[in-house]
């Protein structure tokens, strides 16, 4: 099964809600950081993907139709290149809103140096994505904004959806060419 959707949006941009939404629309299973916690054998290969080292990208997402959140967003361009038919989904929110949520949830986990089995992947995110400064507010916001701008710049407009947190079903369903469900959009944000 080839990956059909590459999620390029950072964690804390509604990625867990998006995972649920994509699965409801038939694009599941959808990979998310929560899957890594249940697959410790995937940690080192994900670190390799983030660091740009040789790794079997197909194996990392084997069995998944979509992937969102960290770690895939940290290597989004590798996956977009490897799966040229896949659509790119960039989930976003305001930089200040993202920082507040990130700082209160995943930021300290990324900054920590004691991750046990997840160490190599979290180190890769901390060093490669955030340049070793994941809790430096101004730097992290600049990284977030530069990442989003890079995704938009490098992806053809007919291949990307920039999805603003809270936009509901319509833009997503239009982009994917599927009907809008007759139910509320999933709301899975655990912290601001």
Where on the chain are the PLM-derived regions?
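Glycine-rich phosphate-binding loop used to anchor ATP phosphates in small-molecule kinases
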Residues: 60-83, 88-91
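Phosphate-binding beta-loop-alpha motif at adenosine-nucleotide cofactor sites
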Residues: 135-139, 154-171, 175
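A conserved mid-domain beta-alpha-beta active-site/ligand-binding segment of alpha/beta enzyme cores
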Residues: 121-148
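Short, well-ordered alpha-helical microsegments
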Residues: 15, 73-77, 99, 168-172
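Conserved phosphate-donor/acceptor-positioning beta-strand/loop module used by diverse small-molecule
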Residues: 79-104, 172
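Alpha-helical packing segments of well-folded alpha/beta enzyme cores
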Residues: 75, 144-151, 168
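PAPS-dependent sulfotransferase catalytic core
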Residues: 1-62, 122-131, 181-192
């Amino acid at each position: 099964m080839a990956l059909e959707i590459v999620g390029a949006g950072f964690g804390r941009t509604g990625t867990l809600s998006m995972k649920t939404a994509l699965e409801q629309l038939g694009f599941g299973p959808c990979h998310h950081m929560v899957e890594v916690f249940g697959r410790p054998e995937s940690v080192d290969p994900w670190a390799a993907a983030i660091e740009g080292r040789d790794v079997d990208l197909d194996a990392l997402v084997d069995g998944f139709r979509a992937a969102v959140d960290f770690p895939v967003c940290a290597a989004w361009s590798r996956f977009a290149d490897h799966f040229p038919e896949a659509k790119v989904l960039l989930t976003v929110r305001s930089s200040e809103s993202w920082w507040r949520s990130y700082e209160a949830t995943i930021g300290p986990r990324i900054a920590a140096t004691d991750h046990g089995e997840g160490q190599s992947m979290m180190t890769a995110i901390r060093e490669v994505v955030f340049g070793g400064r994941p809790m430096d507010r101004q730097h992290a916001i600049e990284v977030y904004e530069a990442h989003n701008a890079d995704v938009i710049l490098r992806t053809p407009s007919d291949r990307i959806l920039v999805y603003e947190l809270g936009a509901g079903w319509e833009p997503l369903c239009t982009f994917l060419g599927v009907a809008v469900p007759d139910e509320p959009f999933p709301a899975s944000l655990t912290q601001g």
